[in-house]
Amino acid sequence: MCAKIALLLVLVGAASAAVLPDKFYGTFDLDHSENFDEYLTAKGYGWFTRKLVTFATFKKVFTKTSNKNLFDYSNLTSKKDVHYKNVQLGKAFQGEGLDSTKHEITFTLKDGHLFEHHKPLEGGDAKEETYEYLFDKEFLLVRMSFNGVEGRRFYKRLP
């Protein structure tokens, strides 16, 4: 009997962990960055590309769906928009990256932080990378790292 109760608690805990917390839902506009040019340099981007990326506008949008275990995500930029529909935490899917190539993408949740992992599926210069989303005061902070160089982008929630 104790084993059944323990199993039930594990299953309930796993099911509740599969839901994106409400704090992530909304539209977030890029406010400022820290160490982002250094991060892009570490990734091997040249001066011109770094300036294009640095001066582009970025918005992150997390939207609820009719299924509480799924969400929609949009990364809106002045160069290109990407939209992922019916995302399930922990389940990989194929989608287009900002570099216009196919990626295997997985969103996961750990200790209240959301992780977006991209694995490029086509040739080219794109490298595997992970973005970490967490809250820092009133900002949605997105952290990314390459070869020990961390870039941080701070997004402000729009009304």
Swiss-Prot record:
Source organism superkingdom: Eukaryota
Keyword hit for Secreted: yes
Keyword Secreted in record: yes
Keywords: Lipid-binding, Secreted, Signal, Transport
A single MF term (Gene Ontology): lipid binding
GO CC annotation, single: extracellular region
Tissue specificity annotation: First detected in hypodermal precursor cells at the time of gastrulation. From the two-fold stage through to three-fold stages, expression is localized exclusively to hyp-7 but disappears in newly hatched L1s and subsequent developmental stages. Expression from L1 to adult stages is found in a single neuron in the ventral cord with a process into the nerve ring.
Extent of the signal sequence: 1-17
Coiled coil stretches, renumbered: none
Subcellular localization, as worded in the UniProt entry: Secreted
CDD domains reported for this sequence: FABP (cd00742)
InterPro entries: Calycin, Fatty_acid-bd, Lbp1-4
Free-text note on domains in this protein's UniProt record: Forms a beta-barrel structure that accommodates hydrophobic ligands in its interior.
Similarity annotation: Belongs to the calycin superfamily. Fatty-acid binding protein (FABP) family.
Job of this protein: May play a role in sequestering potentially toxic fatty acids and their peroxidation products, or it may be involved in the maintenance of the impermeable lipid layer of the eggshell.
PANTHER family: FATTY ACID-BINDING PROTEIN HOMOLOG 1-RELATED (PTHR22725:SF2), FATTY ACID-BINDING PROTEIN HOMOLOG 1-RELATED-RELATED (PTHR22725)
Protein name: Fatty acid-binding protein homolog 1
